[in-house]
Amino acid sequence: MALRRSMGRPGLPPLPLPPPPRLGLLLAALASLLLPESAAAGLKLMGAPVKLTVSQGQPVKLNCSVEGMEEPDIQWVKDGAVVQNLDQLYIPVSEQHWIGFLSLKSVERSDAGRYWCQVEDGGETEISQPVWLTVEGVPFFTVEPKDLAVPPNAPFQLSCEAVGPPEPVTIVWWRGTTKIGGPAPSPSVLNVTGVTQSTMFSCEAHNLKGLASSRTATVHLQALPAAPFNITVTKLSSSNASVAWMPGADGRALLQSCTVQVTQAPGGWEVLAVVVPVPPFTCLLRDLVPATNYSLRVRCANALGPSPYADWVPFQTKGLAPASAPQNLHAIRTDSGLILEWEEVIPEAPLEGPLGPYKLSWVQDNGTQDELTVEGTRANLTGWDPQKDLIVRVCVSNAVGCGPWSQPLVVSSHDRAGQQGPPHSRTSWVPVVLGVLTALVTAAALALILLRKRRKETRFGQAFDSVMARGEPAVHFRAARSFNRERPERIEATLDSLGISDELKEKLEDVLIPEQQFTLGRMLGKGEFGSVREAQLKQEDGSFVKVAVKMLKADIIASSDIEEFLREAACMKEFDHPHVAKLVGVSLRSRAKGRLPIPMVILPFMKHGDLHAFLLASRIGENPFNLPLQTLIRFMVDIACGMEYLSSRNFIHRDLAARNCMLAEDMTVCVADFGLSRKIYSGDYYRQGCASKLPVKWLALESLADNLYTVQSDVWAFGVTMWEIMTRGQTPYAGIENAEIYNYLIGGNRLKQPPECMEDVYDLMYQCWSADPKQRPSFTCLRMELENILGQLSVLSASQDPLYINIERAEEPTAGGSLELPGRDQPYSGAGDGSGMGAVGGTPSDCRYILTPGGLAEQPGQAEHQPESPLNETQRLLLLQQGLLPHSSC
């Protein structure tokens, strides 16, 4: 094989050579800017390697001459890897002579290396002699100064290194715009004795080709860290508390530890300090006193020292679980079941939390049945077999847990009652029967005596009482009790004692209901300021209807709180619309002398609870089920209809959200909870004048900035409610704090389009969130647009749509009745286990009502009082979907 170097170009005649072998390779390197063409043409190097040096950015052309082979497959190789450069050219000089060219138009440092060409012949690879290509340029940095954070006046070092070719390379250091060192050979280390403020450093590298400047490094001063924030008690028990916090700015020094101080509040003098390494930024406080108020604060430290303490954060440990078991558990058989009674448990120590419901467990056929939750000290057991022995136990519970179980009560299949003792003991039924008969006779006698006395008092009042101290006869008269709903003198007198305004009393006169006219039942939900209970209301025809009673807590004694609570009822009294919750009545619960009565607002019983809890249950409940898009749009139409009615009556709601919309038995949605609503008597806006708990993430921009509320601000909240519905109950602006919402919105950000949300629906949402209130659509426009969208969707079959389930009113279900929903294997229960879709199943909000499966029979004449509407809502939506009703437009 012959090797020759030349500046050969395409068409260059081959140089005279001895007769070549079967295959010959020739590699030539052309540096057109280094050698003139005339000088290169006569260059002949036989078989010797070549070193080629070029400047960065110059062109280079390499060629390879192959003789003794037809159409060779010439490959270029650099440092052992095949070159993928597309700028390659292969030219035949003769049938047995080919020249290949590899062009590098602008050489970079990465192009430097060892090149050769190779050809395969008969399974063997022939390679040429190599060419070493060296690329020269300005220095290239391999190490540059890095940013640092150092204590004030503390010494530190900065490093800089650069390489050629060409060598040598020298380093010059700069501090800002001042030269402070060099030139020094590369690599170079700069020693600095210290700085008192943030300072910038850089280095320059010089060689024969020029100079290069490094990045600018900033040396920051370390400082004490900032105070922690977002201190939260994440988990509480009677003796332990888990605390988490977010660290403040670390002062550009690694945080090493945090200190948590805890003291009893108020006025605690002993402070417990716990030092924990970080991260994580959490701490577990142990050995706390149950049912005790504490305060804690946190600070963190780096190498320079500790941060300031954050503000004190109060918390209270939970009380102890009940320590006593119910006593005197006994049973009475009746035709309808087995009545169980026991003595009420009284807390033994102030550290025990408030006692809650009782839990009853019963065993039959050696199998434990489900536990029952019972309010009060009496339970009626119906789901047992009277032909088999029964064992019953009961305990009391509170927020912490359950107390000890009572002694088991054995009810034999041969006995008429049970006895307390070991599971296999027996008792005679004769004494029990005699005791029951005696109790019945005594109760009947007392009832007759009380009835006779009551008739006299009602007829004449109570007169001619005891004489006064001076011996003179005195006549006392107590007004006869009246149960006439039209003139409830007793309740009116009690209203006078509340100190509420005369205007509010006048509004409530015709909706006052005597306390004796309804019976309170089980607890449906609790909130911060009150609770909701099921009740049976006796109507004028003697029949009973199930209602929900919303009442304030017994320890709320301020007249202002009571008046604010009753104002919501007065507000609801004015509403009469199928998609707006309507007031049934108002009552007062009497208490001991000297204590204010408890106000109660009576509302329709909504079988399926609040819309937010229903949406959550469909997505993350124990048995999730599917809600079709048509159903979700139908929910929005109902809410828009209700808000259209409210806005037409000059009412602004101010708290529109999915949690404040209720689901009736036929699955229609009603707008409810008017605790923040206001009527606009003049103009079209209301300005908030005092501090209240407001739903920040549902508020419009003008409400956040200026406490200004209009119908247009309700439209904004309706857009957020639409987003809640489409996401099946997700929290809006998740991960954004309330204090950050205004800046987030003013920056042009809005809630993102939910998955599976139609573009038309999201466009409506986005219009509701316009920064200019005048650009937001009205509720009439929203209702018509949503009806148009619903009309374009396919009609659901009865098996697909939960709205078609129980549209016709069926028999009233028993307590704990259920509703079958698509995709659910088991019915959901009532308030018993908290797992249903009513509000009882979730975390109760601020006395939100109503919410657990049940039913409310339609009141006679109710339809006559509803405002005239074009069609029943369900009929109108079905006609829209089937194209039988023309769509209106905004």
UniProtKB/Swiss-Prot annotation:
Keyword check for rRNA-binding: no
Membrane-spanning parts: 430-450
Reaction(s) this enzyme catalyzes, per UniProt: L-tyrosyl-[protein] + ATP = O-phospho-L-tyrosyl-[protein] + ADP + H(+)
Gene Ontology cellular-component terms listed: cell surface; endoplasmic reticulum membrane; nuclear envelope; nucleus; plasma membrane; receptor complex
Signal peptide: 1-40
First-listed, main subcellular location of the protein, grouped into a coarse class: membrane
Domain Fibronectin type-III: 227-320, 325-416
Residues recorded with modification Phosphotyrosine: 681, 685-686, 804
This protein's UniProt keywords: ATP-binding, Cell adhesion, Cell membrane, Disulfide bond, Glycoprotein, Host cell receptor for virus entry, Host-virus interaction, Immunoglobulin domain, Kinase, Membrane, Nucleotide-binding, Phosphoprotein, Receptor, Repeat, Signal, Transferase, Transmembrane, Transmembrane helix, Tyrosine-protein kinase
Record-annotated Protein kinase domain positions: 518-790
Ig-like C2-type domain location: 41-128, 139-220
Extracellular side: 41-429
A GO term, aspect molecular function: ATP binding
Positions glycosylated per UniProt: 63, 191, 230, 240, 293, 366, 380
Modified sites of kind Phosphoserine: 466, 818, 869
Tissues expressing the protein: Abundant in the brain and lower levels in other tissues.
UniProt-annotated location(s): Cell membrane
Pfam families in UniProt: fn3, I-set, PK_Tyr_Ser-Thr
InterPro entries recorded: FN3_dom (IPR003961), FN3_sf (IPR036116), Ig-like_dom (IPR007110), Ig-like_dom_sf (IPR036179), Ig-like_fold (IPR013783), Ig_I-set (IPR013098), Ig_sub (IPR003599), Ig_sub2 (IPR003598)
Membrane topology type: Single-pass type I membrane protein
Gene Ontology biological process terms in this record: apoptotic cell clearance; cell adhesion; cell migration; cell surface receptor protein tyrosine kinase signaling pathway; establishment of localization in cell; forebrain cell migration; natural killer cell differentiation; negative regulation of inflammatory response
Binding site residues for ATP: 524-532, 550
Protein origin, superkingdom: Eukaryota
Assembly behavior: Monomer and homodimer. Interacts (via N-terminus) with extracellular ligands TULP1 and GAS6. Interacts with PIK3R1; this interaction increases PI3-kinase activity.
Name under which the protein is recorded: Tyrosine-protein kinase receptor TYRO3
Species of origin: Homo sapiens (Human)
Designated gene of the protein: TYRO3
